[in-house]
Amino acid sequence: MSRSGSEEERFSSDEGMEELGDFIVSDEEPNHESARDDDAEVHNDRLLQMTSTLKPNESQTQKLLRAHISVLVSALGGPDHTSPISPPPYKLGQDALACLKDIKRWIKSVDEKKGNFDVALACADSGLVVNDLLVILCQWDSQQNSKKPLKNARTMEKIMLSCLELLVLLTWPTDLNSESSENQKLHFASVRKSQIVYKKHILAYNKGQTLKAVIRLVLPTIAKHRIDREPRDNAILRLVLFFIRNVLNIEPANSSISTKSRKHVTNLDNLPTNVNYDDISMNAVLSCFKNNKVLMFLLTLSGSLGTDFDKETFGQPCLECIYLIIKGVKTQDILNPQQNSKQQQRYQQQQREQSQQDQNPIQSVTTTSGLELQDLLSEESKRKKFQTQNISTRHGRFGSLLSIQGNNTSYVISGQEALLDTNSSLAKLDESKKWNNRSHFKYDSDDYVKATSEFLNGSSVIILKEFIEQFLSGGCFNTLIECIGWLLSGTNDLNYVDDYEKACYFLTVAWFLNYKRERNVLFDILGTANLDEDDDGLDYGSVSAGLSEVNFILIISYFRESFEAKNWNSLHVAMICFKELLLISYSIFSRFSDRGLQGEEEADDDQEEIDKELAEGIIRKLFSFNDFLNIVIQIPQTASKHSPEYLSVCISVVHIILKSFESFANENIKLYIQTKRKRTKQNKKSINTLDKATEESLRDVIEGSDDELENERVKEVSRERRLDFKVTEVRFFQTSIVSTYVEYLSRYEELTHEEIKRCLSYFHRLFVIRKDFTGLYRMDFMYILQKLRSYLPKGSSTRDHVDEFIYYFMKKFKNAFERFPNPVEILFPRFEDMEYKIFLATGDLYLKPEKNNKRSSVKIAKNIEFIRDNFSLDEKLKILVTVLYIQEKESLVTWVIQELTKITTNRLMNLSSEQIESNTNEAVQLYPLEQHRRLLINNPYIRLLLTLVGFKVPFILEEPCELPDNVETSNLTECLDSIKMWSNKQPVTFDDGKDAMFFLRTKEGYNYEQDDDYDGHYDENDESIAFETGANPDGERHNLNELDELDKLEAALEGKSNKDTDLPRGVARIKNKKPKKDLPKKSKANSRKKHLSRRPPKSFKVVSDGEEEKQEKTKSAEFVHGSDDESDYEKENEFFDREERLRRLLEESGGIVNPKQLAEFKVSWSKLESSNGTDTAISVSKAIENTSFVEDTMPHTQNIPEELTLGAINESNSDIDTSSDSEPELNGSGAESVSAIENDKTSVSSFTPDIHNETSSKKRHIILQDRDSEDEVDITTGNHEIKASNPRKRRVVISDDEE
C-alpha cells in the first residue's frame, strides 16, 4: 500500500511540474526512463521534499505552487539582523526586482486566467504583504523624508512601483456569485480574511505610512503638466487610485453561497483571528486617510478632472473612492453630531455606573464596537419596555392557564400575556398555530445598497463633515459628476456600462442631494448664524450637476432600462436617486407654503423665484413622458415581493409623488406630459359615388399637396397633454398598490412613527378624501389595524391618529355590513372591475356606457346590388336570407323577424280609426343588440335586406336603424312572411345549382375598401386633427363641382366621335383611356408629373411649368403658411388683376363670356353635328363664324402700339410645354397646322378648358391662325407686340403666361 501511495504522489508531482514547467528553474536533466523495479529510489528534489505533505482540500499542484512562491518571497529580502539599528531595517535581495516581477507573472497566469485563488493564498501564507511589501514602501518613504541621497534611485523607484502593483493585485475586490468557479467558492473566505489582514496592517503599520508612501510615488506625476505626462505617468496615478479604492472596499464577507440551505445564502463571521471590526472600520479609515493626506489627494484629483487630468482615465476610480467613503453613512449623523454626543454621554454614564457595580471592564463608546453595542442595547430596552407593558398583571408572578371551550373543541392558553385582554389571548392562540407559508420576499434588490449603517465616532464625523464641505464648496462634486455624466451620456446604450459603475454614480448623486437638502433644512431651523464664510451656501448651486439636464436624462433612461430588464438591484438604486430628486422639489414647495401660511415676507425674492423654478423644473423633467409615469405606477404594484428596503423606497416614492401633485394642484401649476401614439395615414377617399374615371381625376386634385405622406404608412407622433393631477392620482390607488401598503404596514414593529404616519396618510387619502370605502374593506387590513393600535403606546400621537381612523372606518363598515350581511368579499382583495366596485359600494348594478371613440367604430360595408333588376321582392329576400344562413348569421335573421313582428303587431293593434282614415304611421327606430350592432355597419347583406324592407340603415354605431313612417304595413307584412318562409326552408337550392352569392355583386362608385381608416366619427377636440377639413369659401379649391365636367368638355372640344356612347347629341362623351398594357412603363416621378400636367389648376388659374415646380414644394400652403395674414391681401389683388385681364381679352377676342353666347354655341354645334361634318376643325371654325365669336377683320389689333416686337414670341416659346402627352390630336388640316407651328417652334394649345400648365411669365398670348395657311397673328398684351397675318378663318388659343 505504501509503495502504491508513493507512486501516486510521484505521478501527481510529475503532472504538477508539467503544468508549471515554464516557471520552474531546475539544474537537473529530466529523466524519462521508467523504473525497472518497485524498490527504485525516487529522485530526491528539494521542492518535492517541501511538498511531501498535503493539507485538506489541497492538490499536489497547489502545494508545489506554494513552495515556489515561498522561495521567491525568501529571495526578495528580509530584516538585516547584522545592523545595529533596532528594529533591524529591511534589506532587499540581490534580485529583488526580478522576484517581484516573477510573483506578478504567477498571479496573472494562474489566478486571473484560470479563475483561481492559489497564488493569492500562497502569498498570504508566505507573508508577502505584511512582512515585505509594506515594510519596503514605508522604509523608502522614511528615506525620502530624511532627504538623504539614495543609491540606485531609479532602481528603487522601479521596486516601489512593483510593490504597488502587487498590492493592487492582492487587494483587488473579490465577489462571490453564482458564476464563480469551484476553486473561488472554496477559497473565497480564506482570501477575504487575508485581505482583511492586509487592510489592518496598511492602516496600522507606522500609522498608515504605506498610504503616504504610495502618494509620494505619484507626486512627480501630479507636478507635471497634462501635456508633458507620459502613459506611464497616467498608469502610476491610476494604480494609486485603485489601491485607495481597494483599501476602502475591503470588508468582512457576510454571505456565502450554499446549495443545501433553503435561503441559498448563509451568513458567516469571516473576521480572521487577532482582528476586530474596529481595526478596519470606517473610523480607522477616515483617521488614517486624514493623517496621510489621502482625502486631500482625492479632492485635488476630483476637482481637476477634465482640465489637469483625463476624465476618461481617472473619473470612474475617483467616483468609486468617493462612493465607498460615504457608503452606509447617514447624513443625519453628520449634520446632527450634538444629538449623538448627548446619547453617547448618557450611555457612557450608564455604563460607568454599571461597571462600578459589576467591576467589569466595558467597551469604549467611541469605538465602532461600542457604538454598535449602544444601538443594540437601546433596541433591547425598547423591547423590554413593550414586554413589561403587556405582562404587568396582578398575577404576574404566578403561572396560569386559560381554557377556551367551544361546542366540540377546547383550547388551552398558557402565559401571562394571554390574561391581559382579549386581543392578547387571541394573539397567543395564533402563536400556537403552525404556519407553513414561506416568506415571499426575494432579497434580490440590495446588492448595491448597504442595509446596515456605519457607526461613526465624534472625530470621524468631524473629519467626514469637513471633507464633504470642502468637496461641495470647492466644486469637486460638480466637476466629478459632470465628467461621469459626460461619459455615460456618450454611451449609446447604458446596458454596456457595468452595473456597479452605474450604481456608484446614482447613489453618489443621491447621497449628496440628500445631504444638501438636510443641511438646508437644518439651517432654516437654526438660522445662518452658524454658517462660516468658507462653508457651502444654502442654495443648490454646489450640487447643480446632479440637477442638470444630462442627469435627468440618465436617471430616466436608467430607470426605464432597469425596469424593462427586471434588474431589481439597479432599479432599487434608480428609485433612491429618483426619491431624492422628488424630495428636493417637495421641500422647496413646502418651505414656501409654510412661509405663506405664517405670513412671512422674504427679502430675497430673486432667490425664492429661482428655487421655485428649480422645484417646478425637477417635476417637469421627471414626468415629461407618459411611459415613464406608467413605469412609476407599475413598480409599487410588485414591491412587496422584494426586500423590505426596496419596499420602503417604493412607499416613499409614492408618498412624495402624491404630495408633490397635491402641491402643484394647489399652486395651479400646469404640467405637460408627452404621449406617444401611432397614427395611421388614412387612405385616399372617394369624393362621391362617381364613376372611377372622374373619381381618380378628382382625387389627384384634392390630395395633390399630400405627397410627403405617401412614403410613410405608419408614423409615430408625439404630442403634449396637460397632466391631470386628479386623474393621475387615481392610478396610485389600485388594489395592488393598496396591498403593497398593507404589506408594508404589517411590519409595524420595524417601522418608525414617521413611516407609520406615511401609511396612514395614504389610507386616509383613499378612504376619507376619495371615499373609496370598498378598497379597504379587507380582513387583513382590519386585522393589522387592530394589532397596530395595540402595539402603539397610549400616549403616542400616532395612536391618536390610528384611533380616529378606526372610528371613521368602523362607522362606514357598519353601514356596509348592514347592506351585505354576509360580506365574503372582505376575505380577498377587491376586483378592479367597475361592476364589482359599483355593486359593493352602492348595491346597484353597473351599466357599462357605450364607448364613443374612434377605435370602437367599424368600417362601412360595400354597397352591393343584384346582378339583374327583374328579380321580384320575394326572390331578392330569398337570396339575402340564404346568404346570411351561409355566413352563419341565423341569429341576425331571427332578430329581424322578431323586430318586424313587433312593428307589424303594434301597428295593427294601436292604429285608431283616425289614423286608418289618414293612412299615417309613426316612424320606428330599432336599437340592435350589442352583438348585432357592428354587423349592421360592416355586413352588406343585412344592410341590403333591411333596405329592401324599407329601413334606413345606420352608418355609425350610435345611429339607430330607422323605419320611416311612409312604409306601409302591408309591405312589412309581405316582407315578414317571405323572410319567415325562406328562413324555415333553409338550406335553399337555386337553378342550375348556383350559389346565392352568384346573384349579388358590388356596386361601382365609392371605394370603401380603400377607406379603411374611416370610422364615421369626428371629434372637434381631437388633437390628431391638424386643421378643419371643411370647404373654405376663400380657398383656391372651393368650387370642386366645377371640375365634374372636365373630361366631357375636353372630349367635346377635341371633336371626337361619340358613336360608341349613349349620350344625347350635343354632349361630349368621356375620353377613352389607353389600355395599361399598351402604355410604356415610366417612373413614378414621370407618372406623377404627368398627372400634375393633366390636373385642372387651382381656381382655374393657368400656371407655368416653373410655377408648378414651385408649388409642388409648397405643401398645403392654405393651412400651414406662416405669413398668411400678411400675404393674403397681395395674393387677392394679384388674382383679381389676372382675372380682369383675362376677361378683357375674352371680350375683345369674342370668347364665351355669358350664358347667351354659350347657348348659341350649343345650337350651332348641334346643327353642324346633324349635317355630318367630318372635319372637326372646319366645324369649329363654322361654329365660331356663326356665333360671331371672332370676326374676320381685327379692328382691335389696329389700336395696339407698334413698339411690340417679335421677342415676346420667342420668350413665350421657351416656356411652352410641347409634351406629346398633353397635346391634343387634330384631324385633317388641324394636324397640318400643328406641324407647321412646330416647324416654326411655336406651340399651339387646343381649345379646351383642360389648360396645360405650359407658361411661366405674366403675359397672355392670343394666337390667331388660319387653318388653310401658316400665316398667323400673335397679339401679346404684356409687351404690346403685333404680328400681322392673313385675316381669314381663324381659331383662338388662349394661354396664360405667369410666374
From Swiss-Prot:
Compositionally biased intervals (Acidic residues): 15-28
Chain intervals with Low complexity compositional bias: 338-360
Alphabetized UniProt keyword annotations: Cell cycle, DNA damage, DNA repair, DNA replication inhibitor, Meiosis, Nucleus
One Gene Ontology term of the molecular function aspect: DNA binding
GO biological process: DNA repair; DNA replication checkpoint signaling; meiotic cell cycle; replication fork arrest
Region (Disordered): 1-41, 338-364, 1052-1134, 1209-1299
Pfam families on file: TIMELESS
One GO cellular component, as annotated: replication fork protection complex
Family designation: Belongs to the timeless family.
Known function: Involved in chromosome segregation during meiosis and DNA damage repair.
Protein name: Topoisomerase 1-associated factor 1
